[in-house]
Amino acid sequence: MSRRMGVSKRILDGYVFTENDKIIEAGNYTREKGEQIIRDYGNNLFIVGAEKQSDYTVEDIVCNETCLLPGFVKAHGHDHESPIIGIAKDCALTDWLDGAVNVFTGFLDEKRDELTNKFGKSPNLVTYLKARVDDIYYGITSSMVHHCNFNKYRVADIVEANRQAHTKMIVAVGSQDRHYDDRILDIPHHLAIDRLDDYQEKFEGVERTWIIPGPDQFFSNGPELLKALKRWSKDHGTLIHIHSSEEPRTTAWFKETYGMTPIEYANSIEFLDSDTILAHQVNNTEKDLAIIKESGAKVVHNPLANTILGSGMPPLKKMTEIGIPFVISTDGSGSADNQDILLAAKSAAQYQKAFHQDASFLTSDVLLQKITVEPAEFLRLNTGSLEKGKDADMVLVDLTRPNLIPSRLDNIVENLIWASDGSEVKTVVANGKVLKLDYRFTLLDYETIIGEVQLLSGMLADYMMTAKKITGTGAHK
């Protein structure tokens, strides 16, 4: 899969050859090619699937019974949510924010000293490392993390988690100055700008990590704050990321309160352009869609969270028809319950095909592009395809699992979308390093990470038994 060879091209017996953190060759494998690689590189090789790791002959280059893909690219998510899976279910977005997100992030902040002593590290780092495990488990090697709520104060921890995991990450740093938890309001709004300046100075040179503005919602950020954040984005040449029109009641409340939709509001302050990435964009008017199209803004669809929280689904077919670019992502583990990005792609298509009674909409090839090459282009990352010069980000999916048998060249992409359950990701390579090999994590201490998150989740449950109930977060405050 590459722009050069064709994003829908399938190769029966292919290979990818990497050096350091880049792909230097990709294409059809032949015995002659294998002999050349052995001759040129000798023991300076790591051959995935080989039984030995030195003194290679061409016979050691095995044909893995896997499907080789680009590493998946997640264009919207939250890395603090693993410990709140299953909390505050069967409720709408704003109730879930009250009952899960803000309770948990407030717990981490309020009990920070106690939790740090317990774990010997920042409790935020504990949960962010679990999010790295979640992504790698499902083959996600690059992401844009919307670092909202109390998390906006803990960027150093997420940068460290990304460094340890050897993944790529854009950190969209949150802000709020109205209609939100009083403890985290950025009043005066220069606090949000000062925070970005500080993070940019501290982390500008950190490899595989980028800082951008990530105001939480249009309803929670006033016009002067959004204008200042947009100026910062332009001055620094970055993207800017925001939730938009996600939940129907809040979207309707916003229009009643401010006399315009969130998109009309954004347009009125010149917030929207080709550098603007909108998460969700579920609830729209025809005028909203026309504004988005004209502005060049892009949309990230998160079907797992949108369905679980009852937010609705965006008009993807209309967006396609008028030329609004969109990709598919998972959102956070707390609202989506997992980071199975193949499931997200399947869920998006299932709904749209059924709703429009059009089985031809969102084919398997298109869906795969919307979790690889297209989000990589959205995020300006040098990944998402298998071709010379791209970052060495790859996923090997195990084709020996019963749900993926039979797989052939003509049905492999269809099987990945419709038959996989996410657990078939066998090996993951990111930036030239093997992160997961034959289902085993190679860089992260998997057992320690999952044990700490299990303990943290139990401590949160105890805390919630006596914690003050939070109400009115988001809208209607």
Report residues per predicted region.
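N-terminal metal-binding scaffold of metallo-dependent hydrolase/deaminase domains
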Residues: M1-D55, T471
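C-terminal cap of metal-dependent C-N hydrolases
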Residues: R4, D391-I450
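Alpha-helical scaffold segments that flank or form the walls of functional sites
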Residues: C67-L68, I87-T167, D194-G205, Q454-L456
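Active-site gating loops and adjacent loop-to-helix segments of metal-dependent hydrolytic enzymes
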Residues: P83-N124, R178-H190, P248-D273, K298, ...
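Metal-coordinating catalytic core of metallo-dependent amide/deamination hydrolases
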Residues: N151-Q281, T285
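Histidine/acidic-residue-rich catalytic or RNA/ligand-binding cores of hydrolases
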Residues: V155, P248-M260, D288-K293, G310-M319, ...
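His/Asp/Glu-enriched, well-ordered alpha-helical/loop segment
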Residues: S268-D275, K317-N403, A419
